[in-house]
């Protein structure tokens, strides 16, 4: 009896996912890694390895849930960001590739500094992916990771523990900078910036499954960010750095806010 191989099953998964996502190739690889417990290079190095019926059944269940628009990272409780793997669930946003630019910029700035220890606030930490990525690539940084959601902090705590960073990343359940009593070298944030009125413009899987508290920033979308900008003057050192992810159409208005703060 013919046993289906990794390569054959990979093609089958890819075809099924084409109707669901534009990232069918990435998601196919992620599903295979999840069910086989193999790294991507091992999957491509052993295309003729047979897949067990049990693993096929698990994959089909994943695909069925994906066809219901449930995001894959929530199904497999895992996703990669900045070449690191994070535990994820629907209490936190799924890390996006464009947010890696924020980490790149932070590391560039940190590496240009003369001082050894840098105190960083990661505001709206969610899964902890930004703070953890910085800590893993800048060994002398200390991070205060803040979120209003206790459930998000539970997820962040799990990821921090997975990377043995509990001594370097301190979690706070709080609102923006209100619970911090130190001057900061760097404030970095990926806060909600979607205007409330844009709810129905988002993809179905975002609306149905991702936490709205982490998406919507008020009537304009910038209210929470504006509050952080106002607070930053008190907490940021004179030679410090303020980095935030925003929606490009909001750039001019927020730039004016920063200049005039």
Where are these regions (language model features)?
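Non-catalytic accessory regions of SAM-dependent methyltransferases
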Residues: 1-36, 40-44, 48-49
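Conserved hydrophobic residues forming the short capping helix/wall of the S-adenosyl-L-methionine
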Residues: 17, 110, 160, 232, ...
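Residue-level signal for inorganic ion chemistry
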Residues: 31, 69, 99, 130, ...
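Conserved AdoMet
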Residues: 33-109
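Conserved SAM/SAH cofactor-binding pocket of Class I
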Residues: 100-201, 249
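Helix-to-beta-strand junctions that scaffold the AdoMet/dcAdoMet cofactor pocket
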Residues: 165, 210, 236-238
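Mobile active-site "lid"/loop adjacent to the S-adenosyl-L-methionine
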Residues: 193-224
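Conserved Class I SAM-dependent methyltransferase catalytic core
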Residues: 219-261
């Amino acid at each position: 009896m013919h046993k289906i191989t990794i390569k054959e099953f990979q093609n089958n998964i890819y075809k099924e996912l084409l109707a669901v996502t534009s990232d069918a190739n990435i998601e196919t690889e992620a599903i295979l890694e999840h069910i086989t417990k193999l790294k991507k290079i091992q999957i491509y190095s052993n295309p003729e390895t047979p897949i067990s019926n049990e693993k096929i059944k698990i994959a089909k269940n994943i695909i069925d849930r994906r066809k219901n628009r449930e995001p894959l990272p929530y199904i497999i409780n895992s996703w990669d960001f900045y070449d690191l793997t994070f535990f994820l669930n629907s209490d936190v946003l799924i890390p996006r590739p464009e947010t890696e630019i924020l980490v790149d910029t932070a590391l560039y700035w940190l590496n240009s500094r003369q001082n050894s220890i840098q105190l960083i606030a990661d505001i709206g930490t969610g899964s902890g992916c930004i703070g953890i990525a910085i800590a893993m690539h800048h060994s002398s940084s200390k991070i205060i990771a803040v979120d209003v959601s206790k459930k998000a902090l539970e997820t962040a705590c799990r990821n921090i523990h997975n990377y043995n960073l509990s001594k370097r990343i301190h979690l706070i359940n709080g609102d923006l900078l209100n619970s911090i009593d130190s001057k900061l070298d760097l404030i970095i944030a990926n806060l909600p910036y979607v205007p409330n009125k844009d709810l129905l413009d988002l993809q179905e899987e975002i609306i149905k499954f991702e936490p709205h508290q982490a998406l919507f920033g008020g009537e304009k979308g910038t209210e929470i960010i504006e509050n952080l900008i106002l607070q930053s003057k008190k907490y940021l050192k004179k030679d410090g750095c303020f980095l935030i992810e925003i929606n490009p159409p909001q750039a001019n208005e927020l730039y004016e806010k920063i200049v005039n703060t």
